Design a protein with these regions (language model features):
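Bacterial N-terminal signal peptides
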Residues: 6-16
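Positively charged n-region of N-terminal signal peptides that target proteins for export
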Residues: 1-4
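Glycoside hydrolase catalytic-domain context in secreted enzymes
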Residues: 18-750
Length: 750
């Protein structure tokens, strides 16, 4: 009997030793395979193979384990194997990057099915999502759809930055939200703390993966040396050293999975750094989303300075992933930089992409164009194609030029047709073997980013886990703390702040007067449309204010006033009406509140020329512009008059350097807020938190110094000096004790 029992036990052990090392469970909408010492697999329709007792997905359904299906092999081995198996039609699909896709429900739309199936597209740009759970279910439906196609290549979903807050959002300790809320990139720079930026990357990447997103179209590390540029807000400011450190921290945070081999794991998100070689030095601040802003200029000869955040930051990480996996060139023509004299948009420039990025700096990651560079441009002011310097070519020819320049992927293009035409042009000029090798090289780079992030093993996400992860309380708190650290106090005359509220229900509780602000009708993003009609309203919710102070209806009742305004807003540098009246259409971009006449502008622009213009000079010398929100200055002046000797605290919501010399004499305290909740402002004003932010850029004394600075040179303006003798320069900020001097200022202040 004992012998029989022993034999039975031995058989059980033998079967266990010889049986599979994995087990399968049903997840919400997909199957999950967990295995001891092996990769976790998620799938819906692909057959499973068992090799050496481990499970593998037979993605191409050929009944054999291909190297690209073998999760035990290095990512580059797998990518090369799969790329070699793909047809040119399939590779053409990998080279596409979708237009913006809003996720309003879990189902895949018919246009999405078309570009996924017929065009073989696998890189999808996700914009708004209805909820984390909806995003998860949509992702799972997309992944199930593409798993059943061809080689089973998963979708690599991506996102532009999605963690910026609204002023009216409220933070409640212990409560969650739809996603963690952080200051703008410029606000993160104002913390002067790369550790905060890395923490943001770690948290945001975890939220992204919970939404089914594996690529971030960020960070924007353009060196913002031109103060009038509308995209200044998305950068880390104007200092090369700070920009470099923040770029490195951001990418490390996004790409690194803690304790994972080589840094890559299921919490990793590919970072697509932008914009090479910098969109910062736009002539006169006009943005290259439009024809009128297509030139980046270098009057100070500082081209190399703009590369540092890439070459010394994003390409030299502290973490195991080593470098950012993708780069996006900007729309601009880097005027006069190519030694050959060829002035074309960066995405079309062999010098910018191959000679510099790939050969000089050794970058072999993905290069993806900015969105819409191969499309036609209909008018100087039109928001459509951005084919700068190659306007005379066809759409297919532009695709060919981009590929010859060294680019791998075409942003905003859903149609493989022009890519296939470009392939035939390559065959015509260089032969079939060279064309195949060139396209296959791009396929390898593109596939690597999906293999490294584990998408081939499990691209699915649990909807319930997504809802629990995105915006969970500890993430919300970290974002809110970063907001508090991003606000910069630039003036505190007579220690007007903090305004300690006192205790509720006690006679010592202070009263605050918050004047209504006029919200003017202003153009939307990139000037595409006008916003809501102009109206008067309070800039902060009364209920929020009353958590700190009593609400004063009239200024004479108040102990102090709190005025919350926007920076001066004055257009994009081009006016169709000026052109209709016989001008060239080019006008100043003002950073001051009062009407501005450009008396110190260049007589001759540095760059110019377009097939749709019969002149070269884009100067606006002598022209005058007004701001949409001049009433903000009037409001500050009126409030100061009403308050008499009582303190007036002004909060300026800023996105770039602004001229505040008109406002400064009428404010006792000034706070600069870079995309933070009003609650953060109230916590600072009330003294609940001490301000610690520093200016990530200079605040200019006047528009003359703005006109006379060189677009490509950092720190070359004359900063404002206030009534207390403080200079509002880079790395300046106040706390309750006065001017901040600490380890951050010692490291970065010039």
């Amino acid at each position: 009997m004992r012998i029989r029992i022993a034999l039975t036990a031995a058989c059980v052990l033998l079967l266990a030793a010889c049986g599979p090392k994995w087990q399968e469970t049903e997840a919400d909408g997909f199957k999950l395979v967990n295995q001891k010492g092996g990769a976790t697999l998620g799938y819906t329709s692909a057959p499973l193979l068992t090799v050496d007792r481990y499970a593998f997905k037979d993605l191409n359904r050929n009944g054999a384990l291909d190297p690209y299906e073998d999760w035990r092999l290095p990512a580059d081995t797998r990518a090369k194997d799969l790329a070699a198996q793909l047809s040119i039609e399939e590779i053409a699909g990998l080279m596409l990057y979708s237009g913006h896709q809003a996720v309003r429900g879990p189902e895949i739309t018919d246009p999405q099915k078309k570009f996924l199936k017929e065009d073989n597209l696998r890189a999808v740009l996700v914009t708004t999502v209805e909820s984390p759970e909806t995003a998860a279910r949509w992702n799972n439906n997309v992944q199930a759809f593409v798993e059943a196609l061809g080689h089973g290549i998963p979708a690599n979903n991506s996102s532009d930055p999605r963690n910026e807050t609204a002023a009216t959002a409220e933070f409640n300790l212990g409560s969650g939200g739809k996603i963690s809320l952080w200051p703008t990139t410029l606000g993160l720079a104002a913390t002067f703390d790369p550790a905060i930026v890395e923490q943001f990357g770690q948290i945001a990447s975890e939220e992204y993966r919970a939404l089914g997103i594996a690529t971030a179209l960020s960070p924007q590390i353009d060196l913002a040396t031109e103060p009038r540029w509308s995209r200044f807000n998305g950068t880390f400011g104007e200092d090369p050293d700070l920009d470099t450190d923040m770029a490195r921290a951001y990418v490390d945070g996004f790409q690194t999975t803690p304790d994972a081999k080589d840094g890559w794991g299921l919490k990793s998100v590919n970072a697509m750094v932008k914009h090479w070689p910098s969109g910062g030095p736009e002539e006169a601040g006009r943005d290259a989303h439009f024809n009128y802003g297509k030139f980046a200029v270098y009057p100070g000869g500082a081209f190399e300075t703009h590369l540092k955040a890439f070459t010394e930051g994003a390409f030299k990480l502290n973490g195991g992933t080593k470098r950012a996996t993708a780069v996006m060139p900007y729309y601009t023509i880097s005027y006069g930089i190519d030694p050959s004299g060829d002035n074309v948009g960066n995405n079309f420039s062999k010098y910018i992409i191959t000679d510099l990025l790939r050969e000089k700096f050794g970058y072999d990651g993905v290069v993806c164009t900015d969105w819409g560079v191969t499309n036609d441009n209909r008018a100087i002011e039109a928001f459509d194609g951005k084919c700068w310097g190659v306007e005379g070519l066809s759409v297919a020819e532009r695709h060919y030029e981009v590929i010859k320049a060294g680019v791998d992927q075409l942003g905003g293009n859903n149609d493989k047709g022009p890519v296939l035409k470009a392939y035939q042009m390559y065959v015509r000029d260089f032969g079939e073997a060279a064309a195949r090798a060139r396209f296959e090289a791009s396929a390898v780079r593109l596939l690597l980013n999906s293999f490294r992030t584990g998408l081939f093993e499990n691209p699915y996400v649990e909807p319930a886990a997504s809802a629990a992860t995105v915006g969970k309380p500890e993430f919300m708190q970290a974002g809110y703390e970063a907001q508090l650290k991003s606000v910069v106090m630039v003036k505190n005359h007579g220690k007007a702040l903090p305004e300690i509220p006192g205790q509720a229900g006690n006679d010592g509780k202070k009263k605050v007067f918050v004047p209504e602000r006029y919200f003017p009708q202003t153009p939307g993003m990139f000037g595409l449309s006008m916003g809501a009609p102009g109206h008067w309203d309070y800039p902060v919710d009364k209920a929020l204010v009353e958590k700190y102070y009593d609400w004063a209806v009239e200024p004479e009742e108040a102990d102090f006033a709190l005025v919350i305004i926007e920076e001066p807003k004055a257009g994009s540098g081009y006016d169709v009406n000026d052109r209709k009246k016989g001008g060239n259409g080019y006008v100043p971009i003002s950073l001051q509140y009062r009407p501005y006449k450009a008396e110190y502008a260049r007589k001759e622009s540095i760059a110019g020329g377009d097939p749709k213009e019969d002149f070269m000079n884009r100067s606006y010398l002598g022209k005058t512009v007004t701001t949409y929100n001049e009433k903000d200055l009037d409001l500050v002046m009126l409030t100061k008059k009403q308050m008499g000797s009582k303190p007036v605290v002004v909060v300026v919501r800023a996105t770039r350097p602004v001229v505040l010399s008109e406002l400064e004499p009428y404010a006792d305290a000034v706070l600069i807020a870079f995309g933070v909740q009003n609650q953060a402002v109230m916590d600072l004003v009330s003294g609940a938190v001490e301000p610690s932010g520093l200016l990530p850029m200079q605040l200019p004394a006047d528009m003359r110094t703005v006109e006379e600075q060189k677009e490509d040179v950092p720190h070359d303006m004359r900063p404002l000096v206030d009534a207390d003798g403080n200079t509002w320069d880079f790395a300046y900020g106040l706390n309750w004790s006065g001017v901040i001097n600490d380890a951050r200022t010692a490291k970065y202040r010039k």
